Each structure stands twice: as structure tokens, then as C-alpha cells.
Amino acid sequence: MERPNLPILLFLLKHIILSKMKYNPKKHHRRSIRLKGYDYSRPGWYFITINCKNRARLFGEVKDKKMILNEAGHMLELQWLALKDRYWNVALHQYQVMPDHFHSILEITAVAAVASTAASPQKRITLGDIIGAFKSIVTVEYVHGVQQFGWLRFEGKLLQRNFYDRILRGEKSRQRVAKYINDNPKNWRDT
């Protein structure tokens, strides 16, 4: 009896497995947590929360109800504050770095668009674009800190894939969220 050709056998096995795992839009899609139909490039106030992957405590610690930033926490803070220099239409308000997450109130003051060519129309810059750029820069800087300064290592990704936002409508809503952000270190539960 002849031995089967191993590369052909592996190819056929892989083909059979992959054919059984076809794309199913009911199973294989990312659900957006953004408000459906809302234009996130338009002016508005947003409450933002960004979490570390697996809630890893990488940015400092809370002591005596005060947040003590480590070097990584200071880096995150500096990158957040730099957003207003990168985006002319962004105003930053209340924010708080926590050991495993970050809260802020961000205001988009006007519609902005990236440069376009005749072949591609202007793309408006959205809240997701701004937060995505911030998360990318923070990750690159954090990796540099791990390599150069021995910051705590992380597995896989530094930050969770998404971010949470709430559209703030009205001054009372903004004041309530600003108080929540301010009080975050006081209400921290070290579990």
C-alpha cells in the first residue's frame, strides 16, 4: 500500500476545515457600541472611558484616595493633553488617569476634515479617529517604556479594543460627569 503524500493531505485537511468555517454575518461581525445614526464628527461634548486590556493596573495606584501616577500614567496624561495640538477642533476638559482606565470629557468644537485629493472626497474626522490615534500613540510610547525603562509588560494589547462614550447634552450632564471623574480616586475600590 502506498503512503499518502503528506503535503497534499495537509492541504486537503486545511481546505475541508476552512470550508466548514465560512463567514457567517450573524456570528462574525463586530457590533458597534456607538449610537446608531449619530454623526460623531459633529460638534459636541463626549464622556470617554478607555480601559486597559484585562483591567491591568499599569498607570499608577490610588493611595489615600488620591491617584499617584507612575511614569506610564504621566506619559498617558501628556499624550492626552497633546491631542489639542494635533486636532485644532478638540477641547479637553476634565480628565482622570486611573490605575487601569482613563476618563475624560472631550469636546469637538467644529467639523474638521482630512486633506483630500480629486479622487477621494474629504473624510470628516470623527471621535473614533481621535481616540484611535490617541490609543495608538499611547501603545507605541508604552512599548518604548517597557523596552527602555522596564515598565510593566502587558499581554497582547495594552488597551481594550473599543472605548466607551456618552454624548453629554446640557450643562447639568457635563457637571455631573465632571464630578464623577473628579471623585473617581476617592471612590476607588482596591479589589
Briefly describe each language-model feature range:
Residues M1-T191:
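Short catalytic/metal-binding and nucleic-acid-binding patches
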